Design a protein with these regions (language model features):
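PLP-dependent enzyme catalytic core of the Aspartate aminotransferase-like
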Residues: 50-127
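Conserved small-domain helix->loop->beta segment predominantly found in fold-type I
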Residues: 1-32, 37-57, 112-116, 121-127
Length: 127
């Protein structure tokens, strides 16, 4: 995690140097196959090391969508373990995908904004 030594992890976003396991573009596509959406992200030193925006050395994780759906610390740990199993353990993304879908099935209501009974991803009429 970039900036961890400076206390920069008190945000809903973290940037991770992923170069030990591949490039950010490849990791982004792998996680997407498992229904985990992250973004590839250039690191400050990527250009000097020959990387570009398609194959950067980093990935960016944000927790705002998970939080909006009501997930808390325990679910974040579970998501981190799913990501680890994909990237480090090289598990099948389709197997992980079913676990992601199962986890998300319990979180279908928007929290912390709008009415608490608003269904997630349902079109909201703005008047």
């Amino acid at each position: 995690v970039l900036g961890a030594n400076n206390g920069f992890t008190e945000s809903h976003i973290i940037i991770i140097d992923i170069t030990k396991f591949g490039d950010g573009g490849t990791i982004e596509k792998l996680l997407e196959k498992a229904n985990i959406i992250i973004n590839r992200n250039l690191l400050p030193y990527d250009i000097k090391q020959g990387r570009n925006y398609l194959t950067p050395g980093g990935i960016r994780l944000g927790s705002q969508e998970c939080t909006r759906l009501g997930m808390k610390e325990q679910e974040m740990i579970e998501i981190a373990n799913l990501i680890k199993r994909l990237i480090i353990n090289n598990e099948n993304p389709l197997k992980i995908r079913s676990e992601v879908n199962e986890l998300k099935s319990s979180f279908q209501t928007i929290n912390y904004c709008f009415k608490s009974n608003t269904k997630a991803y349902e079109y909201i009429n703005i008047q």
